[in-house]
Swiss-Prot record:
Species in which this protein is naturally found: Methanosarcina mazei (strain ATCC BAA-159 / DSM 3647 / Goe1 / Go1 / JCM 11833 / OCM 88)
Residue numbers binding methylcob(III)alamin: H107
Keyword Ligase recorded: no
Signal peptide: none
Protein name, per record: Monomethylamine corrinoid protein 1
B12-binding domain sequence ranges: 94-218
Main function: Acts as a methyl group carrier between MtmB and MtbA.
Similarity section: Belongs to the methylamine corrinoid protein family.
A GO term for molecular function: cobalt ion binding
Amino acid sequence: MANQEIFDKLTNAIVTQDIAGCAKLTQEALDAGISPLDIITKGLSPGMKIIGDKFEAAEIFLPQIMMSGKAMSSAMEILTPELEKTKVEGEEGTGLAITFVAEGDIHDIGHRLVTTMLGANGFDILDLGVDVLNETVIEEAAKRKGQKIILVGSALMTTSMLGQKDLMDRLREENLRDSVKCMFGGAPVSDKWIDEIGADATAENAAEAAKVALNIMK
């Protein structure tokens, strides 16, 4: 099977919530010599983007999101050990990534993938999980004031995305904004939104998120 055919089948497995098929294809891709990064960026991530766009357009609903998440998990169980083998040791002081999904949002497909990719690129990780209060993010950032920190938040829904603006406002109120970098992602998040709320960056996918995070933490 040609690489592109495998990538297309992986994308389709995410979109159709084919959990067993996604795991099988992931292993086949590895066996064919395809790198874990290519499997993620060219096969799995496009499927996640389609799912996110469909959810934003109300073409699918939470149960389908959860099943696609399980398909992604089945792939990541296979890929994470492979990513660990090729883990990039970060330069001294690469920093701590505090990752979280916005309050009111329980999807974690992209969140888990971004967290994995950040860890594979040398970041220390503090994963706060899903449905995280802005207050919790503020508390964790305040505890570590003076360290190199990047906040990496995810939101799949427009309603939960709005909390990102509140978080940025709170960071400024608490005099924490200058001590952290802020990157947000998710289907509704755009460059325009990032500029509007005064954050530092967004990214199209998990691999790009890791590159962007490394760049803005230099």
